[in-house]
Amino acid sequence: MEHSEQHKVIKICVTICRFVLAGVFVFSGFVKTIDPMGTYYKILDYVEALGLMDVLPQFIFSMTSFMLGMVEFCLGVYLFFGIRRIITPYLSVLIMCVMTPLTLWIAIFNPVSDCGCFGDAVTLSNWETFGKNVVLLLMSLVLLKWRKHITPLVSVRLDWLIAIYGFVYIFFVGGYCYRYLPIFDFRPYHVGADIAQGMIVPAGEKPTVYESRFILRKDGEEKEFTLEDYPDSTWTFVDSKTIIKEKGYEPPIQDFSILSMADGEDITEAILSDENYTFLLVAHQLNLADDGSIDLINELYDYSLEYGYNFYCLTSSSQEDIELWKENTGAEYPFCFVDNITLKTMIRSNPGLMLLKKGVVYQKWSVRNLPDEYELLGPLELLPIGSCDKESLFYKIIWAFSWFFFPLFLISMLDLLYKRYYKRNHNLKNEYE
């Protein structure tokens, strides 16, 4: 009796750990895969913090950004359905044994502000991330020790279909999002976002207070100063840093400013308050930008001139790169300077196109699906792309989940029917015997 109760407790613990891990891995893998460029940028943050930027080849970072989410997603699917019961617990423990010490290092030394384990969908502090990983590691160890208690949801005859479909699904989703844009945009520049509102600190909230620290040298001695005790000119400037003196409310959008390269004027307010349409060609690095659609981009600029819309190219490139881009593409549109990280956050395409009106993001396009002359048959006020389609998010959710759950549901039903058919035939055979 006591053994039976112990067996039941172990079974319950294994089931809880299994489904919690499955949910975390599926969600984590999915949000990483739908934003492969965001995952790539986060991996670069880690690599730079570790000092490996010049040691490892660049293609490894790109490949890792794509594979990491796929592995997590497939692992979650395998755990949920209880298939590959030998290798899956080992893989879970292996992943958590890598991630847990890594997040401890991040929590202690803070080389990156956000671990990126859930992409931009959910942001955790570094210590919260470490705590989460400790719990997941313990759960993985429970599964590894009592993996025989994992009850599969499908039979061995059809579990290969689950395994293959999980991989095929996330592979095509990741490929689509890499070629175009993430199907779910969790960043503050998503379609429907009001950029100006995203920069405001609500009434009653205290903003974060920062303090600038300056490192100066005199007679071989380095010392740190603030603005209040900044020394005389006998000290030589070495470096500076900004620290958080008092944590407060941080708006979703920070450091967003647009400087005209023609005269250095800050035109941020003019663009965000303009009631006319504004096209923003976002190219964080022109020397790395895809120039396969330059003719279409120039046609979009001509279209903007024809109907009186604004058109700016936002970049963080040097003047030399801008002049080279103009020479190679025949670009006549005005260029503006914006922070490199801000541009990467705005759109995951280089270049990409955004349509704004009164500071609200109406549309976003990758360089591979820019609107052409067949879509721009008149003024934007009369065209579908000239409206802010917030409802498309609902259809994206339905599309993504239908393509994932419906085939898996069909496979599960087929497996159930097969089990019943086999059981009935087996019983009939026994009766005849």
Language-model features: locations:
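Functionalized membrane-embedded alpha-helices
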Residues: 13-33, 61-102
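Short active-site neighborhood of thiol/selenol oxidoreductases, capturing the structured segment around
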Residues: 254-257, 268-288
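Membrane-interface segments at or immediately adjacent to transmembrane helices
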Residues: 172-266
